[in-house]
Amino acid sequence: MSEIGFKYSILASGSSGNSFYLETPKKKILIDAGLSGKKITSLLAEINRKPEDLDAILITHEHSDHIHGVGVLARKYGMDLYANEKTWQAMENSKYLGKVDSSQKHIFKMGKTKTFGDIDIESFGVSHDAAAPQFYRFMKDDKSFVMLTDTGYVSDRMAGIVENA
């Protein structure tokens, strides 16, 4: 696991599944869960973490390689899920999401910032063939970190956000 003011680990990246782990002293977050719940549990164990300790999963977009394990993890461990409204609509009938309690589903509006414990998270739009894909910037104290995936084009604005992280 690497550390730059945040602890983080790329659990998986590629067309077979994407999942990224981020930790601060107060929060443990997954960005996407594109593998089975069982596989993500195994990958978390490799970095000495447990899925029951996760506070939330942030969803970048509705493609299966980003949401495969989202539903099962949410149901089994009761964690909160965050995505923008169009992504939620696109996932509504997804076999990967299944039945998740409405109290676990939260809207993360694109272009907005949310505070999760000791970390601020900002979302931005991305160029990709999905309903409303987004990427996230994580900010804590004077540090920032960007998680950007599946983009077909890097705009000047995106480059500036990444460059300043």
Map each language-model feature to its residues:
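Conserved beta-strand hairpin/beta-sheet module of binuclear metal-dependent hydrolase folds
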Residues: M1-I47, P133-D150
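Structured catalytic core of nucleotide-sugar glycosyltransferases
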Residues: S9-S19, A56-V70, A74, E92, ...
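Short, well-ordered alpha-helical microsegments
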Residues: G37, I67, M91, P133, ...
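Active-site metal-binding motif and surrounding structural segment of the metallo-beta-lactamase
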Residues: K38-A83, N164-A165
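Short amphipathic alpha-helix with an adjacent loop that forms part of the alpha/beta core around
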Residues: L44-N48, K114-D118, M158-I161
